[in-house]
Amino acid sequence: MLKNKLDYKWVVLLLVSIAYFLPEWMSEDREVMEKEFEAHIKEIGKRYKGRIHNWDVVNECLDQANRGIMPDDYTYKSYRWAMKYFPKNVTFNTNECNLRYDITKIRRYVEIVRDLTDRGAKVDYMGVQMHIFKPYATRDIAAGKFGIYSPTEFYDKLYVMSEAERPIFVSEVTISVPTDSDSDREIQMNVAKDYYRLWFSHPSVVGITWWNLADGGAVAGEPSYSGLFDADMNPKPSYYALEQLINHEWKTRFSVPAPADGLLKFRGFKGGYKVIYTDKKGRQVVLDYTL
């Protein structure tokens, strides 16, 4: 990954759940747990210093039902530890909620992020998930029966999230289908394409992460057919559709003669640009520009 200069992030420093992710040897004493959590974050920070620059700090802090006994205020403390043990130039994110949740939970999430930042926690991005774990729901969406996956409601919820004044990542996307048939592959592709267009169009959304890269690679209990690749790592139609959006439809490429006044105007997507021109002395100049 490092050789190929891929841009990637760590999910997640503290994935705290008694049922699934805490080791059996973990003490139930809050003070002992707090020391273990800090030691864990310190070790990860030391091991990957300078190698990974984008970090989800705490996963799903809104849902406390399956957390069991936890250190007091562990979400805030986790950010403070991360700020202490990681380089200053890395980004820290939240990874929480689901766009299909009701608006009350979305607003609660906004309150949590505001509380963290008001107390000095470094929260650079606000992550929100969108999992369709019920495969037949994707067929319904393709047929216009949206239910809790309403695009209009998703868009409205993103505006509520933007009240936290943080850029938004759609941090985990699952679009599953019941079978690996050609028709279900096409349904997955069309639903994925439409939701990606929706998220890309929102001014606060700065990134999207697909959750399960290949079929059959999900956490136990999650649907089998939810990847961009099949189980043999062959690209599926969804992969090609998203590649077309990201690398072609959503990139501004053009070449024009230099205007007489030397002032070039254009309308393009937000992001990084490489401007190449030839100066009066015939030299080629390359500039990096952010719109």
Residue spans for each PLM region:
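Short, well-ordered coil/turn segments that N-cap beta-strands
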Residues: 4-8, 49-54, 86-91, 121-124, ...
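Active-site cleft segment of glycoside hydrolase catalytic domains centered on the general acid/base Glu
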Residues: 21-90, 94-111, 136-152, 182-187, ...
